[in-house]
């Protein structure tokens, strides 16, 4: 039997781009509205994705990074969440140590092997939330991922990181044309006079990769995280709930078209 797990890596070059918020909400929406079995993996040492679903690791409980370094059973650290159809591998308090190890000779294929061998039969979509940097943890995620979603905000320093992500992908042998699913823009203000300038800069680097749906600035996003739930469950009529649901459908449609294209190429 052929399984069709699709691994999405949410990434950014700097913090404050809405990366973790999108990882959480898109994952929950895929399960709730599209019936997908979703695994979230928190690779960010800040552990915000884990906290946002009430799944923070406490005490001496092992996390992803310790298990990978020790070559232990990764499935033992998958946790259920209160969201139907959504499981999570929480971040670990030893994330910083793993980040150091992973740049000094630790093989960068463990996560990919884990996804292929164990997760493929159990999940339809895996979403990996990466650190806002291009270190060892991000490299591990990029190698393991099928598609990348680059998270940006319409500000100069956020946009400047695009070229670095492109160079990073090339350095690990993953051309951006094949591996970037799209660019997601958050904290969007339709009234801003600089919108087109930022759009033009992004298009000059990643042509035709910007998602049609922009996530508008909305306080309900941070408020929903405090309640450890998705924004559409807590504030269903908010513009953030509408925007992220639309983005979820856009992502799903692209994944389906990419999967059909890949399958047809394999059968030629």
UniProtKB/Swiss-Prot annotation:
CDD domains: ParAB_family. Pfam families: AAA_31 (PF13614). The keyword Ribonucleoprotein does not apply. InterPro entries: AAA_dom, DNA_Partitioning_ATPase, P-loop_NTPase. ATP binds at residues 13-20. Keywords: ATP-binding, Nucleotide-binding, Plasmid. The keyword Transport does not apply. GO terms for molecular function: ATP binding. Belongs to the ParA family. This is Virulence plasmid ParA family protein pGP5-D. It comes from Chlamydia muridarum (strain MoPn / Nigg).
